[in-house]
Swiss-Prot record:
Name under which the protein is recorded: Gamma-glutamyl phosphate reductase
Pathway(s) the chain acts in: Amino-acid biosynthesis; L-proline biosynthesis; L-glutamate 5-semialdehyde from L-glutamate: step 2/2
Gene: proA
Location in or out of the cell: Cytoplasm
Keywords, comma-separated and alphabetical: Amino-acid biosynthesis, Cytoplasm, NADP, Oxidoreductase, Proline biosynthesis
GO annotation, biological process: L-proline biosynthetic process
Main location per the UniProt record: cytoplasm
MF terms (GO), sorted A to Z: glutamate-5-semialdehyde dehydrogenase activity; NADP binding
EC number(s) given by UniProt: 1.2.1.41
Intrachain disulfide bonds: none
Keyword set includes Protein biosynthesis: no
Gene Ontology CC annotations of this record: cytoplasm
Lineage summary: Bacteria, Pseudomonadati, Bacteroidota, Bacteroidia, Bacteroidales
Catalysed conversion reaction: L-glutamate 5-semialdehyde + phosphate + NADP(+) = L-glutamyl 5-phosphate + NADPH + H(+)
Length: 415
């Protein structure tokens, strides 16, 4: 079957979803999670085939790798999504016009959502659970790196759908080639929305070539500013957590900005980073402050390319500033508008930072690692939107709906 026919089938299958009861949707999600638990070894075997084709030193390796613990977490996330309130048929507003006509603004599914992602097999289940719960069919375009894993996961989803009499095309996995990507991006009339999840180069490619509406997600160039009034204890813990908790995710710290007056505390703030072999690219003042305290093999002089880079690795840059205005200027120039944090004890500085930094998530005395749908209480997320239209920040169930107007009357005609 060619890709165009697969997309037509997904579009047709989406119409069946509208008629499903909430109880049916919840039951299918719970059953799918349970089947995943009983087929863990099958999925791990497929994942091992993918891992064998990738260098363990590749930053994508950690994202690609599935473990029994991670699969248990994926199943739990799906069960959690099943417990969330349905985002559909919510009356957003209701007005009665002078002529007696009633107008209701009601949430509805998009229809078919295409998601393009790289070496992240966990996204397969996250996308299906969120799309299915919100009444949308999903078209999955995973990367070739994760093809064995994705196919194993979709087989589990299809087995449950078929057993329940649901058209399995509501979860369609496209071939992992570039031609399929091109077909998806041009599928006007068959696909209602495309969400890319991955590197900045992937997102740029989708933005440049898509004819279908796109919500950009994923790329995170994240900064943390240690202010003149910052608590160094908080700074040490936050910087270490934001950088080393999981380097391959989009909310990981890429650049520490530090006020010049606090350079003497920089060795303490960076004290835990050598435990994870974090390579630091420091500007001249920061390099001088660290040179006798940080391992020589892990400390390098920064250049212009050190800033504005999403490392996705045990690497980070450090920039020294003399004022909040310099901080704001640096972030405005290099940020991907994902997650930015300030460590400060001065309420006015925090207020200005929160007000003037243009990002989806702006933190004060908190690690950027919390930019996550589950951590925000949304359940699993389909991605972190870095744009402003329709959705911004972690995208969960409400962001996967649009609305329509329902108008009722009693024979009214317009003069």
């Amino acid at each position: 079957m060619n890709v165009k026919d697969m997309l037509r089938q997904a579009s047709d299958a989406a119409k069946q979803l509208i008629t499903l009861s909430d109880q049916t949707i919840i039951g299918i999600l719970k059953e799918t999670a349970q089947v995943l638990r009983t087929h863990t070894e099958e999925v791990l075997a497929a994942n091992r085939q993918d891992l064998e084709r990738m260098d363990p030193a590749n930053p994508k390796y950690d994202r690609l790798k599935l473990t029994e613990e991670r699969l248990q977490g994926i199943a739990a996330d799906m069960e959690n999504v099943s417990t969330l309130p349905s985002p559909l048929n919510k009356v957003l507003s209701e007005t009665i016009r002078p002529n007696g006509m009633v107008i209701r603004k009601v949430t509805v599914p998009f229809g078919v959502i295409g998601v393009i992602y790289e070496a992240r097999p966990n996204v397969t289940f996250d996308v299906f659970s969120l799309c299915f719960r919100s009444g949308n069919a999903c078209v999955l375009k995973g990367g070739s790196d994760a093809d064995f894993s994705n196919r194993a996961l979709v087989r589990i989803i299809h087995s449950v759908l078929e057993r329940q009499g649901i058209n399995p095309a509501v979860c369609t996995l496209l071939p992992p080639d570039r031609e399929a990507t091109a077909e998806l991006l041009g599928a006007v009339g068959l696909v209602d929305l495309i969400i890319p999840r991955g590197s900045s180069s992937l997102i740029h490619f989708v933005r440049e070539h898509a004819k279908v509406p796109v919500i950009e997600t994923g790329a995170g160039i994240c900064h943390t500013y240690f202010d003149r009034s910052g608590d160094k204890g908080k700074g040490r813990e936050i910087v270490n957590n934001a950088k080393t908790r999981r380097v391959s995710v989009c909310n990981a710290l890429d650049c520490l900005i530090i006020h010049r007056e606090r350079l003497s505390d920089l060795p303490y703030i960076c004290e835990k980073l050598p435990d994870s072999n974090v390579i630091i690219y420091a500007d001249e003042p920061a390099y001088a402050a660290l040179s006798e305290h940080y391992p020589e093999t892990l400390l390098q002089q920064a250049n212009e390319n050190s800033f504005g880079t999403e490392f996705l690795d045990y690497k980070m840059s450090i920039r020294t500033v003399s004022s909040l205005d310099e901080v704001l200027s640096h972030i405005a120039r290099y940020s991907s508008k994902h997650s930015e944090s300030i460590i400060s004890e001065d309420p006015e500085t925090i207020r200005r930072f929160q007000q003037l930094v243009d990002a989806a998530c702006v933190y004060a005395n908190v690690s950027t690692a919390f930019t996550d749908g589950a951590q925000f209480g949304f359940g699993a997320e389909i991605g972190i939107s870095t744009q402003k239209l329709h959705a911004r920040g972690p995208m969960a169930l409400p962001e996967l709906t649009t609305y329509k107007y329902i108008i009722e009357g009693d024979g009214q005609t317009r003069i």
